[in-house]
From Swiss-Prot:
Protein name listed in UniProt: Probable protein phosphatase 2C 54
Native source organism of the sequence: Arabidopsis thaliana (Mouse-ear cress)
InterPro entries: PP2C, PPM-type-like_dom_sf, PPM-type_phosphatase-like_dom
Occurrences of domain PPM-type phosphatase (ranges): 78-289
Cofactor(s) required for function per UniProt: Mg(2+); Mn(2+)
Catalyzed reactions: O-phospho-L-seryl-[protein] + H2O = L-seryl-[protein] + phosphate; O-phospho-L-threonyl-[protein] + H2O = L-threonyl-[protein] + phosphate
Gene3D superfamilies (alphabetical): PPM-type phosphatase domain
Binding site for Mn(2+) 1: 112-113
Keywords per UniProt: Hydrolase, Magnesium, Manganese, Metal-binding, Protein phosphatase
Length: 295
């Protein structure tokens, strides 16, 4: 007898920024009675990733059909989020987004645990709103170093943890990264140039958080924020080729993934990581700077 269970696969592509759980088949049987074939986009001159028209990557029940829409039935092309437990026994990481709530800024993050994610989401929402409002009144630039120190110090004092957290704040003119290990942020520009804004490092007591500010340019295409479950097995170049094809090219119709190009990109990256044997939780956030809500 088939029984459904809710596994920690979270896909998001709504304007409201809320995460939604999707129902997936239990690992004891396959989706729809068989392994779901995932056809990856063909990438020229890249034999590692490229697939022929008849090639499929089988990703059984670990990845399920994803067709998520927001409350108004619209999809958001600005960002896509996917979290997969993968081959781990538990989901130890969590993602958080704050979209369309703060004038000119959206917030995306990957954290060690749901409690830390929720804390940062609430605290950053308040701190960024306050800083943006104060700076607008004074006509000066935001003090992101103050925001970062306030948030991390409150996290240690309130949540009682020094674990990893990586936050990307996307504004109209800048991208701000607050990093305390655990995930990697890469900004991709025209012709596949990859600019790492944050490297993965295992946080230890005494290691300071890192602040990076990148002034946005017209050649900036998209950002991928992901944990080592992706980066351990998928290269920067493979990531660029796949996401570029999803956002700006054409994918074969699959009937499973939502209309959001950003969500398609995040899902395919997660599926590729699983197909390549990733052993960690996989969290992927794809931010399309060309169609971002704050662009």
């Amino acid at each position: 007898m088939k029984t459904d269970t809710t596994l920690p696969i979270i896909a998001e592509d709504g304007d409201c920024g809320d995460s939604k759980r999707v129902r997936v088949a239990d690992s004891g049987y396959t989706v729809g009675g068989q392994d779901r074939p995932v056809k990856l986009p063909k990438i020229e001159n890249n034999g590692d990733v490229g697939t022929s028209e008849g090639t499929h990557v089988l990703v059984d029940a670990l990845m399920a059909e994803v067709a998520i829409k927001d409350k108004d039935g619209k999809t958001n092309a600005g960002h896509g989020v996917v979290s997969v437990m993968g081959r781990q026994r538990a989901m130890t990481t969590a993602v958080s987004t704050v979209v369309d709530e703060i004038p000119s800024y959206d917030i995306f993050g990957i954290f060690d645990g749901l409690r830390l994610a929720k804390f940062f989401e609430d605290r950053l929402r308040r701190l960024v709103k306050e800083e943006v409002k104060a700076c607008h009144g004074r006509g000066v630039a935001a003090d992101w170093n103050k925001v970062m120190k306030s948030c991390f110090s409150e996290a240690v004092g309130t949540v009682g943890t020094t674990t990893s957290a990586v936050v990307t704040i996307v504004g109209k003119e800048e991208v701000i990264v607050l990093c305390r290990g655990g995930a990697r942020v890469v900004l991709y520009s025209h012709d596949g140039v990859a600019l790492p804004l944050c490297h993965i490092h295992h946080h230890k007591d005494g290691v300071e958080q890192i602040l990076k500010i990148h002034k946005r340019k017209k050649i900036d295409d998209f950002i991928v924020l992901a944990c080592d479950g992706l980066w351990d097995v998928v290269s920067d170049d493979d990531t660029y080729q796949l996401v570029k094809r999803c956002l700006y090219g054409k994918l074969p119709p699959d009937g499973c993934i939502s209309e959001s190009s950003s969500t398609k990109a995040a899902v395919i990256l997660a599926e590729l990581a699983i197909a390549r044997g990733s052993k960690e939780n996989i969290n992927v956030i794809v931010i399309d700077l060309k169609s971002s809500t704050v662009s």
